């Protein structure tokens, strides 16, 4: 390890916890991770620091493996749920079994991913629990939806060559329902990282959440993989008129011709080129009703969600709950900051990850 102080180093934020940031440097000291704080001037101008941010680090001390983030470079992309920057593609992970593939749930994840405008890849894990006929059927089915899936088995270590090629030299966000094997997938792609693995629970066939914070992992092919906290059902919070463009099947139909009306909802309007016999049309109609209901609810609140927050239950039912009033807190004392620093300065990145599992 180099015991020196350098200035103007650049790197990527790979983890955020409390008021500290793990930065993976991309300079001559490749592979070094520094535990950094954020400069006070960044706080004053309201500059947040997110996982995935490209940052400039000052006062790097490789003896203590510490530094200070002095600048956050412009972001190419930004996702708020989970909070991560500069993602280039989303890898949606599902399971062929345990839990079983649910077309409606897959559609929700696909629509949510499409709304980001990022490239989308689909991975189906646990193919060792199914039959070859199932794999073929789902391959054709997802292709009909506009996606080319990668079929893998973490248990049997199968199918990873093509998947790694897809992840090569990209920053990828991993997402999908809980219990499909995302943590096991990361363990297989990056053996030196030991992610907690949760079993699939009982009758509901839903996985237990094993990831609590967004983290970036370095892949052997120079890509970066962001593991997001598992969740069972993403929300549909787009505008009704935007939903059409989040289905590749609809985009393909509109590329061949236009509907008679510019504001066509593709339900009962005459001369509609979208309405018809395509598999996910019913999913589109259900999500459209959800988007319309959400928009109407927002219009009824004069403050546009300023005092209410939207909650979506597992059945897709929307409810609004009052937001907690904002509170003013005292500025953290210097002594408290020093105590936090002492607790973190001797920790490795793996130690911080292990804290999440407690």
Swiss-Prot record:
Q: Which cofactor does it need?
A: Zn(2+)
Q: Which UniProt keywords apply?
A: Cytoplasm, GTP-binding, Hydrolase, Metal-binding, Nucleotide-binding, Ribosome biogenesis, RNA-binding, rRNA-binding, Zinc
The residue ranges of the CP-type G domain are 76-234
List GO molecular-function terms, semicolon-separated: GTP binding; GTPase activity; metal ion binding; rRNA binding
Which terms under GO biological process does the entry name? Answer: ribosomal small subunit biogenesis
Xref: PROSITE patterns: ENGC_GTPASE (PS50936), G_CP (PS51721)
- Where found? Cytoplasm
Which portions of the sequence form the region Disordered? 319-358
Q: Which Pfam families match?
A: RsgA_GTPase (PF03193)
The EC number(s) this enzyme carries: 3.6.1.-
Which residues does GTP bind? 125-128, 176-184
Question: Which SUPFAM superfamilies did the record assign?
Answer: Nucleic acid-binding proteins, P-loop containing nucleoside triphosphate hydrolases
- Entry binding sites for Zn(2+): 259, 264, 266, 272
Which superkingdom is the protein from?
Bacteria
One cellular-component annotation, GO: cytoplasm
Q: Explain how, and how many, cofactor molecules are bound.
A: Binds 1 zinc ion per subunit.
Regions of compositional bias (Basic and acidic residues) in chain numbering: 337-348
Query: Compositional bias of type Basic residues: which residue ranges?
Result: 325-336
Quote the InterPro entries the UniProt record gives.
G_CP_dom, NA-bd_OB-fold, P-loop_NTPase, Ribosome_biogen_GTPase_RsgA, RsgA_GTPase_dom
Family of the protein in this entry = Belongs to the TRAFAC class YlqF/YawG GTPase family. RsgA subfamily.
Q: What does the function comment of this entry state?
A: One of several proteins that assist in the late maturation steps of the functional core of the 30S ribosomal subunit. Helps release RbfA from mature subunits. May play a role in the assembly of ribosomal proteins into the subunit. Circularly permuted GTPase that catalyzes slow GTP hydrolysis, GTPase activity is stimulated by the 30S ribosomal subunit.
Q: How does it assemble?
A: Monomer. Associates with 30S ribosomal subunit, binds 16S rRNA.
- Its name, as the record gives it, is Small ribosomal subunit biogenesis GTPase RsgA
Gene name of the record: rsgA
């Amino acid at each position: 390890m180099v015991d020196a102080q350098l200035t103007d180093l650049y790197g990527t934020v790979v983890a955020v916890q409390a008021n500290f940031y793990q930065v993976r440097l991309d300079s001559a000291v490749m592979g070094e991770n520094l535990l950094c704080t954020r400069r006070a001037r960044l706080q004053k101008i309201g500059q947040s620091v997110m996982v995935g941010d490209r940052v400039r680090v000052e006062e790097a001390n490789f003896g203590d493996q510490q530094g200070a983030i002095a600048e956050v470079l412009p972001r190419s992309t930004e996702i708020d749920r989970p909070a991560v920057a500069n993602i280039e593609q989303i890898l949606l992970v599902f399971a062929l079994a345990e839990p079983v593939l649910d077309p409606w749930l897959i559609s929700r994840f696909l629509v949510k991913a499409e709304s980001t405008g990022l490239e989308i890849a689909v991975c189906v894990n646990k193919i060792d629990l199914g039959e070859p006929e199932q794999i073929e059927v789902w391959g054709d089915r997802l292709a009909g939806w506009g996606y080319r899936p990668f079929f893998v088995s973490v248990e049997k270590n199968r199918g990873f060559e093509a998947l790694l090629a897809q992840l090569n030299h990209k920053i990828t966000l991993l997402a999908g329902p809980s219990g499909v094997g995302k943590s096991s997938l990361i363990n297989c792609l990056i053996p030196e990282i030991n992610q907690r693995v949760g079993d699939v629970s009982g009758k509901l066939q839903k996985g237990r959440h094993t990831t609590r914070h967004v983290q970036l992992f370095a892949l052997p092919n120079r890509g970066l993989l962001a593991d997001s906290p598992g969740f069972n059902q993403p929300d549909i919070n787009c505008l009704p008129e935007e939903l059409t463009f989040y289905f590749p099947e609809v985009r393909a139909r509109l590329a061949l011709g236009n509907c008679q009306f510019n504001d066509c909802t593709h339900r009962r309007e005459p001369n509609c080129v979208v309405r018809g016999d395509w598999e996910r049309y019913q999913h589109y109609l259900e999500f459209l009703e959800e988007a319309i209901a959400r928009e109407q609810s927002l219009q009824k609140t004069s403050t546009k969600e300023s005092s209410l927050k939207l909650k979506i239950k597992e059945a897709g039912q929307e409810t609004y709950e009052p937001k907690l009033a904002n509170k003013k807190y005292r500025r953290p004392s210097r002594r408290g900051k020093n105590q936090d620093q002492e607790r973190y300065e001797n920790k490795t990145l793996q130690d911080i990850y292990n804290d999440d599992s407690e």
